Amino acid sequence: MNSQKASKMTGSLKKNDLYIFDLSEQLLNSLKLMSFDSTLREVEVEKTSDNDRNKESGDLQIARKKVTSNVMRCSVCQMSFDSRNEQKAHYQTDYHLMNVKRNLRGLDILSVEEFDALISKEHGIKSEDENSGGEQTSSDHEESEEASDRDPDLQTNNYMETIIENDLQKLGFQKDESDAISHINTQSPYIYFKSKYLQKNEVLAIYKSLFNKRSLSNPNEALTFWNSQENPMAISALFMVGGGHFAGAIVSHQRLNVKGNAHKKDETLIEQAVNFLEHKTFHRYTTRRKQGGSQSAMDNAKGKANSAGSALRRYNESALKTDIQGVLKDWEPYLSKCDNIFIRARNVSDKKIFTDNTVLNKGDERIKSFPFTTNRPTVLELKKAWCELSYLKILPKPEPLAVKETVQKLEVSNKKDEFKEKQEPLLEEIQTEEIISLLKKGRAPLLISFLKKNKLDGNFRLKPESKYSLTPTMLHYASQQGMKQMALILLSNIKCDPTIKNRLGRTAWDLNRNDDVRHAFQIARYNLGESFTNWDETHIGQPLSREQVDEINEKKKAIENEKAEKLIKLELEAAKEKQRFAKDAERGPGKKLTNIPSIQQQNLNSLTDEQRRRLMREQRARAAEERMKKKY
C-alpha cells in the first residue's frame, strides 16, 4: 500500500489515485458498495441471508413431513379420500399434477371445476388456431401425428404449462421486478461505489469483467486483496486481433515510475506507466482493399475464388493463426499465472485461434472480452485498453427509471397479446409467409408444389400490401433479394409475368442489384423467346445464352485476376525497393577510389624529358610508315 498516498489524500481525487491495484488505504476504506433494484433506485441491503436460508430449510422440512404423512389426504389439492387406492389414483391425475406445478411456482390451488374450465378453454383456443392455420404442409402434419403417438399426454402437459405461464406472467411480474436487488443490477458494465471523497451526485465505477464469479459477489474483498502485499506479482494478458493485425502483451499490475518523464504527443503519462513484461505485434495481408472481411468469410459466403490475391490471403490467414499460436506457446509460463486474459476478436474464427491449442482452454473463466470498443490492434491501443480497465471512473450517479415504465410494462404487453389474438391473420398472409420461406431457402420443387396445391399462379400478390408494396410479386422479391436461381426458375418454369410493376412503376428487372441476377433474367428471355411477352415493357436487357454468360464471367474473372496479379507485383517490387534502400542505408555511401594512372602513363612519367621526346618521335615515325603501307 502506498503510504505517501494515504497521508496526502484530500477531498479531490486525481486520475493517478484511482489505479485499482494501487489505491490508498483511506480511499479503499471509504468505498461503499451500492445496490440497486430493477428501477435503478439505490437500496440499502441488510445482511439477512442466513435467516432467510434457515427459514427456507424449515419450510422444506415441513413440506416433506406433509408429503410423507400417513393421513389419506392430498395436502396440495386439499382433498380427503376414503381409501388408499383412491389417493393413489388421484396422484396420477392431471388435476393433481397441475396443482403441484402451481404450488411449486407459488400460485393458488385450483378446484376441480376451475381446472376443467381452464382446460376446456385452452382446448378451444388450440382448435381455433389449428383451423385458422389449416394450410399445414404434409410433413408438418406427419410430424405432429408422430409426436402425439409417442406421448399421448404431451398435449395436455403443454396446455397446463401454458396456463401456468400465463398466471405467472400476470401475478408474478411485479414481484420479480421488485425483488431484483443487487450490486450487479446496474444495467451497465460497471459496479458502483460511494465514497466520502466524491460529490453527492458522483460515484466510482469499476468494470464487472475484472472480477471472476466468486469475487463478483464481494467486490470490496477483491479490491482489498488486489491492493495487499499478498498479490505483488499479479499479471494479466491482453490480446487483440482483427483485419490481419495482431497485438498481444503481458501486463504487470505494478505500474512503472514515470516521475520526471516528458509528455508525449500520442501517449499520456498514465499510459507510459503501463508495465508490459512482454509484447508482440505483427500484420499479414488477409483482407481485400475496400471490401473488408476475411478471405475465409468471403469463401463461405460466395464460394472459393481462384485468384492469386485470394490464394495469398488464404495463406496469410493460416500463417497469422500459426504466428499467434506460436506467441501463446512462448508465453505459456506467463499465461498460466495470469489473473485475467482479455481477448478482442471480431468473429468466431478469430476467437478459435486462441482456444484451439493446448495453452488456453475454451472454458477458462479467466478468458474475457473487452467491455468496450477498441481500435486497430497496436501496442498503444493495448495500453489505452489497460488504462480503461484498471482505473476507477468518476461518473454521475445513475438516474432511477420512471416508475410508470415498470408499472405499465405488463399492461402494455397484455394489450399487445390481446390485440394479436383479435387480429387473426388472413389466409393470403399465411400463404405469403410460406412462399417467402421457400424462396429464401431456394426450395423450387416445394414452391411449385405449394402453388399447385393451393391453386395459385406465378403472379400471386404478396400480402399484406403495406409490407410488400415494393415487391408485390415473387419475381420482384427474388430480384430485390439477389436470388438469381429462383428468379430464373420463376421466369422459365413458373412463367411469372415480368411486366408487372410495383407502386413506384418498377418491374422486377429494375430491382436487381448485381450482374448475376441480371444474367438470370437475360437467360430466361433467351429460353422463353421473343414471343413470350413484350420484353420492352420488362426493361430486361438483350437475351443471352448460358454459354455467352459463362464467357462474360470468365472475361470478368480474368480481368480481376490480372488486376490482382499486378497489385501483387507492385507490392513485391515496393517491398524489394524498400529492402534495397534499407540495405543501402545500412551500408552507407562508402569511399570513392582516386584516379589511378594507366601503365603506359606510369612508364612515361619514369622517363626524362629527352627520352620522352625520342620515344614520341619514334611513335610518330612508325605511324607514318603504317600510313604509307596502307596507301601503297
UniProtKB/Swiss-Prot annotation:
This is tRNA endonuclease VMS1. It is a peripheral membrane protein. Endonuclease that cleaves polypeptidyl-tRNAs downstream of the ribosome-associated quality control (RQC) pathway to release incompletely synthesized polypeptides for degradation. The RQC pathway disassembles aberrantly stalled translation complexes to recycle or degrade the constituent parts. VMS1 acts downstream disassembly of stalled ribosomes and specifically cleaves off the terminal 3'-CCA nucleotides universal to all tRNAs from polypeptidyl-tRNAs, releasing (1) ubiquitinated polypeptides from 60S ribosomal subunit for degradation by the ERAD pathway and (2) cleaved tRNAs for recycling. It is an enzyme of class 3 (hydrolase). Changing R288A: Abolished ability to release incompletely synthesized polypeptides from 60S ribosomal subunit. It is found in: Cytoplasm; Mitochondrion; Endoplasmic reticulum membrane. GO terms for biological process: ERAD pathway; mitochondria-associated ubiquitin-dependent protein catabolic process; nuclear protein quality control by the ubiquitin-proteasome system; protein quality control for misfolded or incompletely synthesized proteins; rescue of stalled ribosome. It comes from the Eukaryota.
